[in-house]
Amino acid sequence: MAGVMIAAPGSGSGKTMVTCGLLTLLKRKGYNPAAFKCGPDYIDGLFHRRVLGVENGNLDSFFETGTHMRQKLSRSMERHFVVAEGVMGYFDGLGGVSVQGSSFEIGSILGLPAILVVDGRGASLSLMALIQGFLEYDAMLEGKGEEKTHDKTDCDAECAAGMQYEECRKRRWKENEENYREKKSHTSNGLHGCVCGNTDCHESKGKKNNNIRGIFFNRMSPMIYNRIKPMVEELFRIPVIGYLPELNFLHVGSRHLGLVLPDEIDGIREQLEQLADRMDENLEWEPLLKIAAEAGGRDREVPVREEAGAGQQTGNVAGIKPGNKLGNEPGNILHFRLGIARDEAFCFYYEDNLRAMEQAGARLVYFSLLHQEKLPDGLDGLILGGGYPENHGEALAANRTMRDSVAAAAATGMPILAECGGYLYLLDSLEGADGTVYPMAGVLKGHGYRAGKTGRFGYITLGPNRCLPYLREGEEIKGHEFHYWDCDCGEDEFCMTAAKPKGGRSWPCMRTAKQVMAGFPHLYYPSCPGLVRRFAGQCVEYGQRHDRKHDRQERNGQEHDGEEHEL
């Protein structure tokens, strides 16, 4: 078992490029790497999967239970050297003032050691203060997010006698802070206690190891690196495992949803090979492999919040047995052909969502709304994911036969789930990135337009306002919103309510028409197994109504049909 997390003090520090360079190098050296992205991001995963050709997925402590994340990581580490790319700054979580959902929390839950990528551009000795702050804050949190479930076994007699959790948390936080401020002529290294080496020293007693196990400098000159590396290692007793200088050949731009897509960067594969060459020159393998070997061994069994992945069961991705609720016994899987739109315009999918559908009997059929004239024959359902349809408005509008094919399928009652960009495609019209208004599929009334800002952004929990085709009143499903386009439909057309986990803000969202459910939120299907079961069941029923068998009683594993279009 081997794995590391690539984390950083903030976005823009070089996490994605360091991750991609390391994955390229690991693959080159025969380590069979796999990649995970912490949090709800899709685009970084596209770099991992499309450009590098490595398995990838997401680790998300808001969407998933700790048990499910551990199982997923453990399965991957049985066959791969795992590299998990962090999200935003290492401690940044929900609401901007919590570690919930942060890289730190995910690493604490999984016992996954972190390599902190520190951007050295325009700084030198000041980086020492930054590193010390991260190490000490990491240790002060003691592997417990400040809003985790209260466990009285961790508390003293006074607390066990009845101290309220909030009061207990504040007191323990204050004690930890005071302990770290009390130096008494000793220097804390934030990792192994005091540099004096005395294990009985007040700085060493009771201190737990950091998740941060190594430092990697980005955009640093060789001269500064050779001077600062021994200073960091001597003062903080933490290995500095390498650096990258400023790389003028590597240029990865960004747009409103993050990094540009891999296919939009000329020569990206060649650039990453050059990046791997430079990492090979400046990366210290022995300490990296030693750190990676600790993965899983430091699992602290952090209590997982009840709301983290609530409703999701464990054992398989969707928390369901194949064939559940479909009128057949497990093992006799009723297959259905599920069309997945995947091309340059529609490419945002959680791999866990696709696996959940496969476990429910789906045989995935990838197709392109841009390049194919019509839907593949014999589909029983559709999922239209997010992406950048606004950048391809002219081509989507010109493909009239595909728009008509999707509209006809919806009119016959085909089960369809559409998210964000997929939702925009189902509208009457869409304002493209060039300002031109283009006709779309016309399945749902409304016009998609550039809003100019992210009016709704971040994690959400959604609940239906009435019984819906795939959801029942009282059920909840988790999701994420991030979009600069909006729709001019009225609020009375929405069928669900989205609520932020912090701050209490909520808003109406999602629309239905026949068996179509669509909206801006990207849903995490495994957080609501009922949605997966009902959608799968209705896909099977749709195929039966249209007298299609697709060898539904096959006992063999599901296979992928169709081609996945290169991005």
Question: Whereabouts are the PLM-identified features?
Answer:
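A short helix->loop->beta-strand "cap" motif at the edges of active sites that frequently abuts
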Residues: 112, 238, 411-415
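ATP-dependent carboxylate-amine ligase catalytic core
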Residues: 2-17, 23-110, 118-144, 192, ...
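Cysteine-nucleophile active-site neighborhood
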Residues: 389-468
